[in-house]
Amino acid sequence: MGFASISWKDSVRNVSETGEFVWNLATKELAEQMNRTSLPVPDDVDEFQLAGLTAVPSKHVDVPRVLESRAAMECKVTEIVQFKNWKGEKVEGWLVLGEVVAVYIDTSLIKDGVYQTALATPILRGGDYLEVTQDRMFEMERLPGSSKPAFHGA
């Protein structure tokens, strides 16, 4: 699991100090609260409280997860990489990678043993804010001989 940051913000600083993080699924329902966590606030401000979210203890890492998030992954940091330009020069931006050590998923999002992405109404930022919805999904069969993930009943 990983996330990127355009600068050395609280998230990157915190994971570099603790070696742990929790990835919480941002959804359409939580968009405003999640957006509030990006405000530039002093270190002593509780961003959970600022955003109106509930912090709950994790089981395998010492950082909390967001109770209201319908899916979350507890992670141990494996690598923090500073971005480089095409010349190999370091630029402002970071990629944090971690091994997932625990997963929480709202069971209503699982059908026939498979996580139903669109049911969670996840959002992402890819130049702009985007939402994954059921009407934008499509079916695609894997080609003969292509590898299938072992966790998907390959």
What do these predicted regions represent?
Residues 1-154:
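Basic, polyanion-binding surface patches
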